[in-house]
UniProtKB/Swiss-Prot annotation:
HAMAP family: QueC
InterPro entries per UniProt: QueC, Rossmann-like_a/b/a_fold
Binding residues annotated for Zn(2+), in chain numbering: C220, C230, C233, C236
Segments for region (Disordered): 1-22
Enzyme Commission code(s) on record: 6.3.4.20
Cofactor: Zn(2+)
Phylogenetic lineage: Bacteria, Pseudomonadati, Pseudomonadota, Gammaproteobacteria, Moraxellales
Annotated GO MF terms: ATP binding; ligase activity, forming carbon-nitrogen bonds; zinc ion binding
Highest taxon of source: Bacteria
Keyword Transcription in annotation: no
Pathway membership, UniProt: Purine metabolism; 7-cyano-7-deazaguanine biosynthesis
Species this chain originates from: Psychrobacter sp. (strain PRwf-1)
Descriptive protein name: 7-cyano-7-deazaguanine synthase
UniProt keyword annotations, A-Z: ATP-binding, Ligase, Metal-binding, Nucleotide-binding, Queuosine biosynthesis, Zinc
């Protein structure tokens, strides 16, 4: 395991978080993909009670929800699937079937959020998705007495989405503590991003050390009804490169 992966395993991801979280609760955003499942297992190793939250938002790759449900069950955590019809808004190839999901190109991905201004944001970006998801997770956190919300964003190997940047996460955390009963009564909420500084390979190494079975995860933007990946979209391209760079066999089921 790399030093960065080891640090993510042993340290809280945000400096403002309490060092001792073993008696605290967490909410994990769980899509069923590689990053979010790694976050689920990371959270299970840290918090007393973990609630996983997934969203049925009209995504074309909704087989990821089947994976999320199965993985949450195996992990032994409470799992909520929330229905939100983001698809009616359009604006993303992940929700609009009239738009084409582009093929991936490993050479074009930003390697740090500083590069985002020089990159075209791909049409797989879903407008305001992380803001919507985090807002629902915030409500679940208040109901379940959770002090932590865990989300699998990264600013190293990523597709260039603006709502994956650390400054966005920091701003949301400020808002969360201004806008909630928990925040104003002294029960500070923390947005945890354990993968923020990890490459895809480092994320995979971290998950491997935590016992994640990546064969059950679905990352593909065009996964079929059986969860088989296309192998060529942005997400598949990053995932393939991650396993290769990590020196581990890729357990992904590919179509064809």
């Amino acid at each position: 395991m790399t030093d960065a992966s080891a640090d993510a395993l042993t340290s809280p991801s945000n400096s403002g978080a309490s060092q001792d979280t073993s008696q605290q609760n967490a909410v994990v955003l769980l899509s069923g993909g590689l990053d979010s499942v790694t976050c689920l297992y990371w959270a299970k190793a840290r918090y007393a009670k973990v609630t996983a939250v997934s969203f049925n938002y009209g995504q074309r790759h909704n087989s990821e929800l089947v994976a999320a449900k199965s993985i949450a069950g195996q992990a032994g955590v409470n799992h909520k699937i929330i229905d939100i019809d983001i698809a009616q808004l359009g604006g993303s190839s992940l929700t609009d079937h009239d738009m084409t999901v582009p093929d991936g190109d490993a050479d074009k991905f930003p390697t740090h959020t500083d590069d985002i201004d020089n990159q075209a944001i791909p049409n797989t970006y879903v407008p305001a998705r992380n803001t919507i998801f985090l807002s629902y997770a915030l409500a679940v956190a208040e109901v379940t007495d959770a002090n932590h919300i865990v989300i699998g964003v990264s600013s190293v190997d990523y597709s260039g989405y603006p709502d994956c940047r650390p400054e966005y996460i920091e701003a949301f955390e400020v808002m969360a503590n201004l806008a909630t009963k928990a925040g104003v009564t002294g029960h500070k909420l923390h947005i945890q991003t354990p993968l923020q500084k990890l490459s895809k390979a480092q994320t995979i190494q971290l998950g491997n050390s935590l016992g994640v079975d990546y064969s059950q995860t679905i990352s593909c933007y065009k996964a079929d009804s059986e969860g088989r990946a296309c192998g060529i979209c942005d997400s598949c391209t990053l995932r393939k490169r991650g396993f290769s760079d990590a020196g581990l066999a890729d357990p992904t089921r590919y179509a064809g």
